[in-house]
Amino acid sequence: MARGKKMVDRVSELMSQPKFIRNIGIVAHIDHGKTTLSDNLLSGAGMISEELAGRQLFMDSDAEEQARGITIDASNVSMVHEYEGQEYLINMIDTPGHVDFGGDVTRAMRAVDGAVVVVDAVEGTMPQTETVLRQALKEQVVPVLFINKVDRLINELKVDEMEMQVRLAKVIDKVNKLIKGMNEDMYNNGWKLDAAKGTVAFGSALYNWAVSAPFMQKSGVSFKDVYNKCREGDMKSLAKSSPLHAVLLDMVVKHLPDPFDAQKRRINVIWHGDKESVEGKSMLTADPNGPIAMMVTDISFDPHAGEVATGRLFSGTLRRGTELYIIGSAMKANRVQQVGIFMGPTRVEVEELPAGNIAAVTGLKDAIVGSTVTNLREMVPFEALTHYSEPVMTVAVEAKNMKDLPKLVEVLRQVAKEDPTLVITINEETGEHLISGMGELHLEIITGRIKRDKGVEIVTSEPIVVYRETATRKAGPIEGKSPNRHNRFYVELEPLDQVIVDLIRNGEVSMNQTWIERRDILVANGWEKDEAKNIKDISTTNIFIDMTKGVQYLNETMELILEGLHEALQGGPLADEPVQNMKIRLVDVKLHEDAIHRGPAQVIPAVRSAVKAGILYAGDSLLEPIQKISITVPTDQMGNATSQIQGRRGSVLDITSEGDTITVVGRVPVAELFGFSGDIRSATEGRAMWNTEFAGFEIVPNSLVKDVVIAIRKRKGLKEQMPRPEDYLA
């Protein structure tokens, strides 16, 4: 423990000096070596023993992670590295690479300022490499590159020294192409990766060595030495002369920004408040004496301390006993109980923690992932976290023993707090609890944790695909009457243009903006000024516009109208699935002058039925989730790979060859991917490597809609026939 204690003292000293802090994330495609890399960095910093590094999986502290050999949650750790005689504090987050856990990457990118992108030298860039890189650039996180498993190139693929350098250059080129394609301005302003400048390192995380151009000049180690040592299997002397932690952390300190530099640039992107306000100026300068401004990026449960909220502190200083507010919640003061930092799975308490650091705080009981935490009564919240994937699969869970039901409800509430990419719903009529997640593995892990960590025995259904509903044409005006017939609401509906859907998904159009800012963006994208300035609500990718003129009592009724709208959009008329990509206009309203006759029981059902009937009139159709799939096989197995895609209602988008392997890229509906792993293995004699990524929703073919709708309605206990608009307009 003495080693840990000494480390905490060094960390505490550096915390208050932002120019000596680096907040970094380790990101990559699954199995490219992030966690092994993280462990060896920790070993170099003297936090775990050298013998255990790479096998201990210190960062994978969860039993499920160790058993599966993958990272599921993002893990935080703080350590100290010495560069040119000065100590630096490195706050590092190791993130998952499996596509099902992409939400953890999204959240980690908000907390950090720089990212080490890890790419396997043999496999090269993969779909998840692209996704994590896009997320980093969106959050203004500066990347550096580590090409891992270089020893495999030499010992498995038997390439010569020249070929090795050509292959490594290809990987750098591919990553640069991705950066340029995603944001040319950043690429031209110094974000281009360049081995000569030292923003790229090569090595083997498993064997604990790495080289970079600056380090080779300093140490006299050449590519020839690297090649020869790998051929001879003498990795130990490489690890001695070019230790991984020294090369990589030198690169991190030299090329990734400190919180001062990063926040000057990042705050403009992740916070839309007034930059001249007290909190605005304080965040731009990472001022420890300013108001507290923290963004929660993770919630975990400690059996002794309860909920632990981890997040980036952009301004102010956290101390025990401080009263903080969670913006957007009931505005009750939450008293900080403990302030700490993470050393892998262990949370270590500190006296105080200033701006520019990643904090672990207990006592913030109202916080959820994405919360803005401050000591101000009012503050513009941080930009919401946007995930590139959406839930595509659902399982129903029930408690094995009825006595465990209250415990299950509490556990599901905790699980939803810990992982905001999950959607938990309770069907009041059937009493079933539904968990929707990013894929089969995601749901398997979550249900496994409920049993193992939370001690609740549960029974789960087979996974079901998540569908969405949308309109395909214009409809309206449709009249919705209140039950007492004294209030009438008229709505028009049409599909929302894809350009606007993308702007909402990317956070460029939201209700957090000023109405002028939002109006200008929409007008620039082809909207009428009148519509653009009268938006009353944006929920998921649906926009609600008030186009009425001079209706008495409308303002005081608007909250109820929005409640009716949200109820209609949460479960559409066709199959009670969420509605998306709709533009809904309120064009006229007739309200009773007496408030008692236009209460919730009158307004909410009237609006709900008008919207649901309108969606049916507007050609309601189902959307199904699609996944992009990449299959890499030997050349002679190409036919088997393509037939696996085409036989599942899929289409082949691209076929590329490299050496004696071929990569087939296609799109396949998630509904057709059940059992895929077994089928592709047997079809290709176990010689296929594949991965998937979320590719949005597409309309279900007409010939299948009726069968799918009836099956969903049957499962949900609804009438087993196709609904009609008249059903909602009694």
Curated annotation (Swiss-Prot):
Gene name as annotated: fusA
Keyword GTP-binding: yes
Domain of life: Archaea
Role, per record: Catalyzes the GTP-dependent ribosomal translocation step during translation elongation. During this step, the ribosome changes from the pre-translocational (PRE) to the post-translocational (POST) state as the newly formed A-site-bound peptidyl-tRNA and P-site-bound deacylated tRNA move to the P and E sites, respectively. Catalyzes the coordinated movement of the two tRNA molecules, the mRNA and conformational changes in the ribosome.
Binding site for GTP: 28-35, 94-98, 148-151
Coiled coil location: none
Organism of provenance: Methanosphaerula palustris (strain ATCC BAA-1556 / DSM 19958 / E1-9c)
Record-given protein name: Elongation factor 2
GO cellular component, one term: cytosol
Keywords: Cytoplasm, Elongation factor, GTP-binding, Nucleotide-binding, Protein biosynthesis
Residues of the tr-type G domain: 19-260
Gene3D superfamilies: 3.30.230.10, 3.30.70.240, Elongation Factor G (Translational Gtpase), domain 3, P-loop containing nucleotide triphosphate hydrolases, Translation factors
Location in the cell: Cytoplasm
GO molecular function annotations of the record: GTP binding; GTPase activity; translation elongation factor activity
Keyword Ligase: no
Family to which this protein belongs: Belongs to the TRAFAC class translation factor GTPase superfamily. Classic translation factor GTPase family. EF-G/EF-2 subfamily.
Major subcellular location class: cytoplasm
Positions where Diphthamide occurs in the chain: H597
InterPro entries (UniProt xref): EFG_II, EFG_III/V, EFG_V-like, EFTu-like_2, G_TR_CS, P-loop_NTPase, Ribosomal_Su5_D2-typ_SF, Ribsml_uS5_D2-typ_fold_subgr
Annotated Pfam families: EFG_C, EFG_III, EFG_IV, GTP_EFTU, GTP_EFTU_D2
